Amino acid sequence: MKEFRTLALGEIRLPAGQSPVILRARHSREICDGCALYQSDPNRLTPVKPMMKLLSAIATTFALCCGLSSAAPKRPNILFILLDDQSPYDLKCYNPQSPLETPHIDSLAREGMVFDGAYHMGSFSGAVCTPSRHMIMTGRGVWHLPISPEAKQKELCPLDIAQQTIPALFNRAGYATMRTCKQGKSYEAANKLFTVRHDATKRGGTAETGSAWHGDRVMDYLAQRETRKDTQPFLIYYGFSHPHDVRDGTPELLAKYGAINHTDKSSPPAANPKQPKLPPNYLPAHSFNHGHPGLRDEVSVSGVWARRDERTIRNELGREFACSENVDIQIGRALAKLQAMGELENTIIFYTAGQGMAIGRHGLQGKQNLYQHTWRVPFIVKGPGVKPGSRVEGNIYLLDVLATLCDLANIPAPETNEGTSFKPVLTGEKQSIRDTLYGVYCGGSKPGMRSVRKGDWKLIQYDVMNGSIRETQPFNFKENPDELLAEHRAPVVVALTGAQPAGHQLNLAADPEHAAKLAEMEALLLAEMRRLDDPWRLWNQPDDGLTPPGQNSGR
């Protein structure tokens, strides 16, 4: 009976002048049949096959060993999932009380890392998604984009940087790149560089007109890779048109959330107990004109228009949840396919949205504000090296995605990149990559609104309507995480939401106890505006204009 002994490399000791021949086995390195066998005397190797077979085995082994020593580690696949308009508070991983059912997104959160501090930097346009998607593609800050108001200043905004965007970088690195997403409101020069591209705006309630269309494009692409036996790593930009309005859900999911695709502008939709409850920071109107009169998202969205009554808002939340669950179904299809192909374990998955959404919170409907429900975005990462069930602050911007994807794929980030890789957060080395966050919305009247956050404190300031409205809103999130205002204490509002704000849960601008903190936050905001080349100044700031851009601006 031949005796096989499994050995570690370097374990064999041979007489002088003899060398071991080692074949790679399924689970370990062995001296095996066809080369030589250890028998009872571990100091002597006894040939057991004819010389020709032995020489053949030696040659095969040598080639195999050489190939193994030079083989590069398998590069990760990347699945980047991007929704259009989703507040993090819709998801159970951010709001356990949410009735929205997204089992596949929930599983990504359980098996990956949830970011509590992920933000889009803001917008100078009512179409917030346009600069947001430019920032994702380019890794550049909001004031340094090719479409920025400062684009005429070439030193701030290089115009032709499509070749330094995600698809171009990954194409050159040998990745297969594929994209499906809504049509328009993004960086077209970059979008057309994906090797495979299927863009169309799909916000209907059928398989052909809704999110299943995007899902089918990804499923077809994966099936084709499987048929061709492709080994090239892939980057899939898996974008959805929902839950952006018009939120026409499928009949089954609308019924689940008690909603209808309401089209009668003259009356509110019918009440239904299945509809989601009003959020705790709901208001029937915003506290003041927030500076963008006639804004489409606030007055023209089908099913809502300018209404903020309970029935309208709860129905619209139900529609949004129906659309979001349909997106989750499509994500589940892709994950199952990757699992069946044996690719899931080597795939890094990012889940996020281009921006958040209000839908009744603070009396607003759209995405043109800087409250947490809209300035923040959901952000989940699952993949090799990411600790399951982990949660971090992160303090990332969407513009950090490019640098991070490059870092994870071992691709040098381009010189045009301004973002910071958060790979050290994903690997557990850090909890966050910055301590200060800046936000802007000035798509209406100028200078518009600005925000800054550091630690538990956040400041929003408004300078709108030709200076007729100037408001300051400092919040302490440790005490007031929902950014509740005095208006939230109104009995009619409390009766609708069931949420009774505590005495300290309000705008702290007039509180003398926090005057020093307010001054500190105002100074911090000005410093960020200067550092990031914000071209405007608020009423209480020096009119110093632009400062030269700093190295690695956007960090």
Residue ranges and their predicted role:
Residues 56-67:
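Bacterial N-terminal signal peptides
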Residues 83-99, 107, 123, 201-212, ...:
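Active-site-proximal cap/lid insertion segments
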Residues 1-45:
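Extracytoplasmic
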Residues 102-103, 136, 182, 345-350, ...:
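Polar, surface-exposed loop/tail segments
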Residues 95-133, 139-140, 171-178, 262-275, ...:
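Short, structured active-site-proximal loop/turn typified by the sulfatase FGly-forming signature C/S-X-P-X-R
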Residues 131-234, 246-254, 258, 429, ...:
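Catalytic-site neighborhoods of secreted/periplasmic enzymes
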Residues 74-79, 111-116, 172-178, 229-236, ...:
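Loop/turn elements at helix/coil->beta-strand transitions in domains of secreted/extracellular proteins
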Residues 94-98, 114-137, 179-190, 239-244, ...:
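Short, solvent-exposed turn/loop segments enriched in Gly/Ser/Thr/Pro and often Arg
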